[in-house]
Structure formats: C-alpha cells, structure tokens
C-alpha cells in the first residue's frame, strides 16, 4: 500500500528568509506543503512567491502567540497590542475569551482568501495553540464548517483526554524534526516509527529558512538553516521513495 507523507513547512509569511527557504525546500527538496501566518508583514511577499509556485499547497497557520492580531483581542494582547506566549498561562487560569478567538480565526481565514485568492488547503497553528483543550472544539467546528482538513496531534489529544469528532486529517502528526541535533537519519527515524505503528498517512512539521534579521531575533534560528540543508538532500528524497512514501498534501487526505 502506498503511504502518504506530508512535509509541511510552517511560518510562511513570517519573514523573507523564511519564505525563500520554504520555496527552496519545495522546489529542490521534499517540502510538499506549507502554512501561512496571516498577521505577519511578509505575508504579501509569501503570496507573490506562491503565485510563482502554484503547485505548492498552502494552508493557514492560525496565530495567537506572535505579532499583532487582525481584530481587537483585549484578553490576549499586552500593553503594546501584541500577542505572546502568555496564552498558556491565561488558558490555565481560565481567562481565554473564546468569542475573541473565534473572531480572529474568521478574520485570518478571510484575509487568507483575499491574499491568496483561494481557501487554504488545511488549518494548523503557530505553537500548536489549536490543540489546547479550550480552543480545539472551536477550531474543529470551524474546519468542519469550511470543509477543511486539520492538523491533529493525536498523541497530545490522547494525553489531554480530548474528544475528536472525526476531523479530516492524517493518521499521525510528528513534530520531532525540530531542535539542535537534526540529521537525515533523525528524519528517517520518524518514518520508521510510523511504519512500526502501521501508519500510512503522516505529516512531519518543519521550518526551513535562510537566516535574516527577523530570524536572528527568534529563539529558533540557525536550526532552520540546518533543516533547509537536510530537506534539500537528494539522498533523503531517495530514501523516502525507497520506503514507499509519496510526497503530498492535505488535499490527498
């Protein structure tokens, strides 16, 4: 049986270095999908690159922890009007305003359609905020309403005791291709683990990029360049084919 591998590059639109890295890894490597951050300054640059590379499937990377929201989100922004990683503390304290989050989700979706000229192929989120138990039902309902596939971290859902109402997704999502010690072998190990568990559709997350000034301020900077080098390796692509995987997108789910 043919197996589906989605190699999704997160953070399309974050900055030009990220945008160019994703396109490089798509054109000359194994990246087969990407997701766009609609509240970032370089989203229009990303959209222009998308027009030049129409075969690249583009989904939406819902953002609640970076930059400025598109709508008024008084419950989540700081004094500067910016979002941040304090979302988790507010979630634990039961202080999330789900009406504001739903409004922002709709605004980011509508902007995606306006900027890219089509709906996203699927939805995921920056820092996996859509897998928070308080937020997930809202996202799942929105995905069903729009007939969109959704990235599902099934391990996280199981750990949190979350109820999944048959979202359209892959059998497995792996965030393991991330960190300081990345190699081609570490990527292949993720696929070997999926094989051992009888999984036939898997998404692997990645963040390939060329380094620019914006990424220099990120806590995850130079490994993005390492990711780019690995993801454009001809040997890795050949190994994936030999393992019986076909590169694809959420449109194939």
Curated annotation (Swiss-Prot):
Pathway: Glycan degradation; chitin degradation
UniProt keywords, alphabetically: Carbohydrate metabolism, Chitin degradation, Cytoplasm, Hydrolase, Magnesium, Metal-binding, Polysaccharide degradation
Gene Ontology annotations for the cellular component aspect, listed alphabetically: cytoplasm
The UniProt record lists the keyword Amino-acid biosynthesis: no
EC number(s) from the headed UniProt entry: 3.5.1.105
PANTHER family in the record: CARBOHYDRATE DEACETYLASE, YDJC DEACETYLASE FAMILY MEMBER
Protein name: Chitooligosaccharide deacetylase
Provenance organism: Yersinia enterocolitica serotype O:8 / biotype 1B (strain NCTC 13174 / 8081)
Gene for this chain: chbG
